[in-house]
Amino acid sequence: MSIDLPALFFSASGRIGRLRFWIGALALLFLGDSAATFLRSWFAPGIQPQLIDFAVTALLAWPDFCIGRKRLADRGRGIFFALAYTGYSLLAALISIFWPLLSEKPDGSFESSLFLAAIYTCTLFFVVECGVLKGVKGPNAYGPEPTLP
């Protein structure tokens, strides 16, 4: 099994199966978490940790979009779903910066619980849509069926 990493992370065309999606998503998760941890220790305590998290998320937005776009194309989903996939990550990271300023209530408040429920619902949707469900059999509008799952 050979994976073209530049195409996986930097090309938004074509389709990928679940295996390549998980490899790419977990690689980005590891890279993003490692970079954020390093940057937090480098800049701490002078900068808000959520700001670093947003910066890392923004830097990884294009590779994240490419992986999500190709996997969602395999599922027969259009560009709207791919934009929502990446936009959701950016929006969640951005809201985490301003949430303490906007919410004067404790973390256990109804608004906090509602926000977390929305985050978890979106996360669950994309995990199932991209990582669990099979792609469309045969060629579709986005290209031929991937050779690997």
Map each language-model feature to its residues:
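Membrane-interface extramembranous regions at the lipid-water interface
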Residues: 1-32, 64-79, 127-149
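Hydrophobic alpha-helical transmembrane segments
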Residues: 22-23, 52-55, 83
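Central hydrophobic cores of alpha-helical transmembrane segments
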Residues: 25, 81-90
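Membrane-helix interface segments in multi-pass membrane proteins
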Residues: 31-61, 88-125
